Amino acid sequence: VEEYYEFLINKFEKYKKIKIHNFGLLDKTFETKISKLGAGSSIFTRSEGVAEQKIFIKAATEFIKEEKLTEIDLLYMNIEGSEYQLLANLIESNEIMKIKHLQVQFHNYVDNSKIKRKEIRKQLNKTHKCIFNFPFIWERWDRRK
């Protein structure tokens, strides 16, 4: 969302090591619309009378390769239902191994969210250790040594 992007550019302008990108990450590259609901903005939820904006989504695996990322210290993920697609893709591509610390909020309004979360947690447990788990609130995972 354009105004969130501008806000972050201004907030982090002093920090030269921080790069802000005006796109989201998922399992594939495409354009879509997002509902503008502040912290609850989502490509999954639509409400009558709520403003929407066209946004660009880039495949996370493509972004990791383009940026030549070999290690990601922290992936903080509160992406309003898109976490299932993104994590499944990172696990399947083995890019998950580049992530040292993962903090994720799973959302339960997505179809089959309990089943999807259970499967992702099972896969994550092979590469990462769960540090804390408050189901559908917050979870923290650290890469196994």
Language-model features: locations:
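Phosphate/nucleotide-binding beta-alpha loop and adjacent structural elements of enzyme active sites
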Residues: 1-145
